[in-house]
């Protein structure tokens, strides 16, 4: 996935929490995206900023096909409960998930979106609740 947003939106924080859940690092900053494949810029490969600790080098994947764009927005920015159906990132044309990056459930929301995109879960069409008659 590609995580983007303004400074202070929680990109590195969310990345750290996703790494703790078993996700792999491609890049913490300056991602190069070519034909849907993301890779780190040469001088930053394997580096991640751990605020309050410093720059850490760790194992990383050299490249991966991106399947989801995660747009982190400031905490005071409202996010619709039910976003536009089939929302796409205008920069990448990837499916788009908007999040508050520092929200406690952000990693779970990313995992659920990835599960839906990879067939491990089913995203129901909006307005379609099982058991509803109308």
Residue ranges: model-predicted function:
Residues 1-19:
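Glycine-rich phosphate-binding P-loop
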Residues 12-14, 36-37, 83:
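Hydrophobic alpha-helical segments, principally membrane-spanning helices and signal/leader peptides
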Residues 15, 57, 104-105:
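Generic hydrophobic/packing signal
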Residues 20-75:
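Conserved nucleotide-sensing/catalytic segment adjacent to the nucleotide-binding pocket
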Residues 65-134:
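Conserved NTP phosphate-binding and transfer environment spanning the P-loop NTPase/kinase superfamily
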């Amino acid at each position: 996935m590609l995580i983007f947003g303004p400074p202070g939106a929680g990109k590195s924080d969310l990345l750290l929490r996703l790494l703790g859940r078993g996700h792999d690092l491609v890049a913490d900053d300056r991602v190069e995206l070519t034909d849907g494949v993301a890779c780190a810029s040469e001088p930053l490969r394997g580096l991640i900023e751990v605020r309050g600790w410093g720059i850490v080098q760790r194992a990383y994947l050299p490249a991966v096909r991106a399947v989801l764009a995660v747009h982190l927005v400031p905490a005071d920015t409202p996010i619709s409960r039910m976003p536009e159906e089939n929302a796409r990132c205008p920069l990448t044309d990837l499916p788009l998930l908007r999040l508050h990056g520092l929200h406690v459930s952000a990693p779970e929301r990313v995992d659920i979106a990835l599960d839906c995109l990879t067939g491990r879960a089913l995203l129901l069409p909006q307005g379609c609740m099982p058991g509803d008659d109308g």
